[in-house]
Amino acid sequence: MSKVIGIDLGTTNSCVAVVEGGKPVVITNAEGERTTPSVVAFTKDGERLVGGAAKRQIATNSGRTVSSIKRYMGSDHRVHIDGRDLTPQEISAMILTKIRRDAESYLGEPVTEAVITVPAYFDDSQRKATQDAGRIAGLNVLRIINEPTAAAVAYGLDNEAPQKILVYDLGGGTFDVSIIEIEDGTFTVLATGGDTHLGGDDFDERIVEWAVAEFRRSDRIDLTKDPAAMGRLKEEAEKAKKELSSALSAQLNLPFIAVGKDGPHHLDLSLGRPQFEMMTGDLLARTVQPVQNALRDAGISASQLGKVLLVGGSTRMPAVERQVLELLGCEPSHTLNPDECVAMGAAVQGGLLQGGGKLAGATGAAAQGLVLMDVTPLTLSIETLGGVATPLITRNSMIPTRKSQIFTTARPMQTSVEINVLQGERHFARDNKSLGKFKLTGIRSGFSSKPQIEVTFDIDVNGVVKVSAKDLGTGREQNITITGSTNLSENEIQRAMADAAAYEEEDTRRRERLELHNQAEMLAYKVDEALSKCKKELDKDEKNRVRNDLASLRRCLRKDKPEKMNETEEANLRQAKSQLEASANHLMVLYSTEQDAGRQ
């Protein structure tokens, strides 16, 4: 049975982990890094880059590079590339595919199952979009787990004392806060809140806006009109933000950022930490209300918290730690790596699912079995007469859960009713998000009696919603899993899966061609060196044969570019390489013997 991996699919960076010996272990990617940038790029040659390779070329290829796609999950946003409109699910699937392949390389076996994390405040359509992305990437998503819950699991694995903890999760694009009670191996989420459009990206953007304004004032040039310049500036802004976490000032230095009538212009600015904190103070202030709401909903005060965990790379900013200390009156814990703990918790959840609730190889409570009890972050309602949003399941209700309520039609003789399913906290339907609509038809009508329609909401362990409506008079029932206009249909998912498989096959072919090209270059170099050292030991015919075959291989190498190589060119290169290997076999044996003798 293949292992279940845990994936933190982040806005700016993603991380993957697996349980080994009862403990979660972070898997390094092909580049040797423990996190992978959530960036996808398409080169003009048609090559697809994912991760670090994609991020490194943002400045020169900004129009064909996609980052922070997580912010658009569950929306109708599209990325237009080479005549195709790619959905956020498809872009996310490209990131997940790289993560899956890196995990397969580490484990030495196929990976088909995963637990993927999402912000606690993700709504139904965003959760479904994440599931769809996993499917497109060739993964069976066993569970969608909230990021703060995953972090709490990673913490609680080695801290079994009964306690209530607050997880403050400020990532690249989202903010979450959850209050979780840990006791006897049970993790119970008491309350959750957040903002799905607040994160490190917003702090970067403030630096970019400031730098653009400063450069416009000093050099009279508007950098926003140059995509390449903006790409470089965004990269430099992120770097400056990170520097300001440990230094009191950071330098933004971009030579030749623009060209004016008087020649090239250079950007050279100094940003102090106090100025940065003043520029971004309102962003940080947006985290206060969700924290206070979560405490209120959980029915506890800050003094009852045993620990405050900081999660997400953005919590490294000193201002975050100061605000948490002022707000909650306790020093935040630095027990966890904020970039890795979410993936580690997801891996533990995967191990529990695979082990029937127990973690193989673990000790303590984890060996006996861990239980996760999460909540739904937003109220679920239906639209009733007058455009009112009538709640059926309130936010912070434990999941899985099921709730029914009986309604009647608005008018006599009405034979059908449209059910508008809503998610949000506002009183009127128009102010909440509509997850989808469906019709119940064939209702028994009459002037003397009012039909009774039972509406049932069902939320599964992934936080995904199913709705049914039943006419109690006729027994007629309509069941649906909510699929709003922003979700993909089954046909669209199947098409995207086929496209992803084709992409993966093409990526494999590109790698094989690059490897062939590199091997051929290395062979040509070694044969050339061997000829210079051992030519006196070869007869004239053998020497000419080797030289001719070496020349043929070099002609192929000069003509062929690995990224543009077609099948004919690949076949010619492969044949030329094989031919040289055969003709130079005797030479290489002589060369190897001579080298061995020289070492002795």
Where are these regions (language model features)?
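Oxyanion-binding/catalytic loops of NTP- or PPi-dependent enzymes
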Residues: M1-S75, V79-D85, M94, R101-Q600
